[in-house]
Amino acid sequence: MAAAPLKVCIVGSGNWGSAVAKIIGNNVKKLQKFASTVKMWVFEETVNGRKLTDIINNDHENVKYLPGHKLPENVVAISNLSEAVQDADLLVFVIPHQFIHRICDEITGRVPKKALGITLIKGIDEGPEGLKLISDIIREKMGIDISVLMGANIANEVAAEKFCETTIGSKVMENGLLFKELLQTPNFRITVVDDADTVELCGALKNIVAVGAGFCDGLRCGDNTKAAVIRLGLMEMIAFARIFCKGQVSTATFLESCGVADLITTCYGGRNRRVAEAFARTGKTIEELEKEMLNGQKLQGPQTSAEVYRILKQKGLLDKFPLFTAVYQICYESRPVQGMLSCLQSHPEHT
């Protein structure tokens, strides 16, 4: 007897979550392995007097977070989280990283023990012993195997079906390949590697570097300076991974889409860079710019810089990561934006 088709739930419906919903919704129509209806949990909001779930289910467009891109009709928006995840075999987590504890607490026990997850969340958390990966939190709270997906994937370009690559990291290769089957398209090409922790760290740390790149753009430093930010930022990413990853760190992972490719595209095209440039030019706070420029969505780079700063301070390692430290201090401790340049000039990579 054929196995029952696998039910998919997307936990999150922002810009990236909606772009991924478009891919999954279209793919499951063609693949008998997966159930034809995809549930998507939506944090309910009112847009122009209508519930966002009603707009998505009737107009098949997330007009707030992914306007201009139609979602497949088999993607069903649900505002009740417990109802959305009920009986799901595959969970795709794509929410701001600061909400992961609450979300996991709410759904633990409501999904089958055999369920598998994949996190597209770019961020880290602090634990009592220092670094805690988002995948670790999900794994510990829910008791399910969890893969990660990170790459050079600007959501609007993915939704427009422009070619890109991405990386899945999975400690159980079979599970990583299952998610590749669910997500891959001719224009969304996926490589699966087993160095999952490094893949996940790349996705979080590159946002800090992108903030630094945005500061340089705001100061009109030029492309040479931005290239230095990218190179030095990559060096700090590798050093951080070697210190804090539990398993072996493969330098080759940084050459995948999750590494240098994602770093480049985020430092040139991402919203962390864009908001950081505005921060440098206007003097407004990060919070003010989030409201003005991101439609209320949260920026991951500054928050991740704060978490990384506290982890490094706890371990007495701040002097080894001057770029990460400078981004935090400029965002939160009123250090002048020009401090980004002095950080580059005195970086230990040059001694």
Swiss-Prot record:
NAD(+) binds at G12, S13, G14, N15, W16, G17, A155, R271, K298, Q300. The keyword Calcium does not apply. It is an enzyme of class 1 (oxidoreductase). It catalyses: sn-glycerol 3-phosphate + NAD(+) = dihydroxyacetone phosphate + NADH + H(+). The active site is at K206 (proton acceptor). Its EC number is 1.1.1.8. Belongs to the NAD-dependent glycerol-3-phosphate dehydrogenase family. Plays a role in regulating cardiac sodium current; decreased enzymatic activity with resulting increased levels of glycerol 3-phosphate activating the DPD1L-dependent SCN5A phosphorylation pathway, may ultimately lead to decreased sodium current; cardiac sodium current may also be reduced due to alterations of NAD(H) balance induced by DPD1L. The gene is GPD1L. Keywords: Cytoplasm, NAD, Oxidoreductase. It is found in: Cytoplasm. GO terms for molecular function: glycerol-3-phosphate dehydrogenase (NAD+) activity; NAD binding; protein homodimerization activity. It comes from the Eukaryota. Interacts with SCN5A. GO terms for biological process: carbohydrate metabolic process; glycerol-3-phosphate catabolic process. This is Glycerol-3-phosphate dehydrogenase 1-like protein. Substrate binds at K122, R271, N272. Pfam families: NAD_Gly3P_dh_C (PF07479), NAD_Gly3P_dh_N (PF01210). One of its GO terms (cellular component) is cytosol. It comes from Pongo abelii (Sumatran orangutan).
